[in-house]
Regions:
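Conserved SAM-binding loop of SAM-dependent methyltransferases across substrates and taxa
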Residues: 317-329
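Conserved SAM-binding motif I beta-strand of class I
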Residues: 330-335
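Conserved class I S-adenosyl-L-methionine
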Residues: 306-316
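A short, conserved alpha-helix within the catalytic core of class I
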Residues: 396-412
Length: 479
């Protein structure tokens, strides 16, 4: 079997991740030997794993594991470890506000604990975080270094660009943080953030201290050290200032971390505008009776299915995702409505649900990005599911997005062996409302044609009409 270095693991000289036999391993180089030993001997590694803040790992002993039989001799190698696998992977350009905030707070929690053990984080990127049962978990064991009390936090600017600034822009500008990462995948610079934030944000001390002050200092060709160091004395912030390294004490580092924690934990998403689907089931023509009838059919369809992971398309608030979760099934719940996904994330976090809520438009899912388009795989290349559920969605795709039924049937068949789908006909009030403002060019959108086209790719397992409506639910198995 071939060993492949992971395409996103090439920047850090401390080591790299590689794949062998569908498993992930991490090589630790000799340049990181002292830090890795300190991480373990100080007790920090044990504490991080105990708190479920860092993935656990197994050290691979030479001669006792077949992996060493396939590795070439490497004079740089110190150790090989096999980290715990977190799947599926997600990235910040797919996260909701509270997901990004929790990932940022995890960094600061880890920093505070690391300082107690004589270490710090040498970088602060959201790509080092994944989510498990609604909670963030750090995945890079090599991000820790020995703390030097005379040196400011080297990752301060990176932390602000990747966590604080996107959150501030969503709070003050209604510019969703996942959209910020789509434009700035490595974090948004301070000068851009300062230009985008409204005037009123200047009266917020956290914004002034972490955004407008460093932006002004960066803009100035010859800033005076006192312009930064005197103002930051109270809060202990650092990063791009002219403050002397010798003056940056452990107390100032703690002040910085605590102040960032206070600022970020106080931020809330801008909820002034209601999400399009906030009241989908309660205040629309779709009644609670419809929802209950649909739930009964759904429960019957999934009762005997052997499935471990489900992709819920157009998940909204995750009502049906939660029903799956109750059966011990892992769910990837996606929707392009950010407030809905954020509410689902909060619930998943509060109840530790095995649901990964992501902001994704299935008609334009996250593409592969990074160097050679290989560092971060596209969404559709990261998911592996047994069942796709697409409830009250097909009319939005066919009529709203002009996607032919043939393309949808083929698409669904490529990504799962089972499909649970709800057909919403033209005489449904929702579809009538959609067609009221546009020409009906969708001659092929009929129940008969839907069944005919989907039968090319799937075998029908079950089919049932939803009482009180003209909608029909289908359970299909891939041919």
């Amino acid at each position: 079997m071939t060993i492949h270095q992971h395409p996103s693991s090439y920047r850090d000289p401390s080591g790299y991740v590689f794949e062998y036999d569908d498993l992930l391993y991490r090589q630790i180089n000799k340049t990181y030997e002292a830090e890795f030993n300190l991480l373990g001997n100080s007790g920090l590694l044990f504490k991080l794993i105990e708190k479920k803040w860092l993935v656990s790992h197994e050290e691979i002993t030479p001669g006792l594991d077949e992996i060493y039989q396939h590795l070439e001799t490497d004079p740089l190698r110190y150790k090989i470890i096999k980290p715990e696998i977190i799947s599926p992977l997600s990235y910040p350009y797919e996260w909701s506000f509270d997901a990004l905030r929790d990932a940022g707070l995890l960094h600061l929690d880890i920093m505070k604990l690391a300082l107690e053990h004589g270490m710090i984080l040498k970088d602060a990127t959201p790509y080092n975080v994944q989510f498990r049962s609604g909670h963030p978990i750090f995945i890079d064991t090599l991000s820790f270094q020995k703390y030097d009390e005379k040196v400011p936090w080297i990752a301060y600017r990176q932390f602000c660009e990747n966590f604080l600034y996107p959150l501030l822009l969503e709070r003050y500008r209604k510019l969703y943080s996942h959209q910020v990462f789509a434009a700035f995948p490595e974090g948004i610079p301070v000068d851009v953030t300062a230009r985008l934030l409204p005037l009123r944000s200047r009266f917020n001390f956290g914004c002034w201290l972490h955004v407008f002050l460093p932006a002004a200092v960066a803009k100035s060709k010859n800033p005076r050290p006192s312009e930064v160091s005197e103002t930051r004395e109270t809060s202990g912030t650092s990063g791009t200032s002219g403050e002397s390294a010798a003056s940056f004490s452990r107390q100032k580092m703690n002040n910085l971390i605590n102040h960032l924690y206070s600022v970020i934990s106080s931020l809330k998403p801008n909820d002034k505008s209601e999400a399009a689907w906030n009241t989908y089931y309660n205040e629309t023509i779709l009644s609670q009776e419809y929802l209950e009838n649909k739930r009964k059919i759904f429960a019957k369809f999934i009762s005997n299915l052997d499935t471990r992971q489900v992709l819920d398309l157009g998940a909204n608030d995750g009502y049906f995702s939660r029903l799956l979760c109750e059966k011990g099934i892992s769910v990837i719940a996606i929707d392009n409505d950010a407030p809905s996904i954020n509410r689902l994330f909060r619930r998943s976090a509060a109840e530790s649900l095995n649901i990964l809520p992501l902001i994704i438009d299935i008609t334009a899912p996250s593409a592969a990005i990074g160097f050679a388009n290989e560092e971060r795989a596209g969404f559709l290349n990261r998911i592996h599911c047994d069942l796709i559920i697409a409830l009250a969605l097909i009319h939005h795709l066919v009529i709203g997005k002009n996607i032919p039924l043939e393309k949808l049937a083929l698409f669904f068949s490529q990504y799962a062996k089972l499909l649970l789908i709800e057909f919403v006909p033209k005489n449904d009030p929702k579809v009538e409302k959609m067609l009221a403002s546009r020409e009906d060019i969708f001659v092929a959108y009929t129940r008969e044609n839907f069944e005919k086209i989907f039968s090319f790719y799937f075998e029908l397992v079950e089919k049932e009409s939803i009482a009180g409506t003209t909608r029909i639910m289908y359970l299909y198995k891939k041919r």
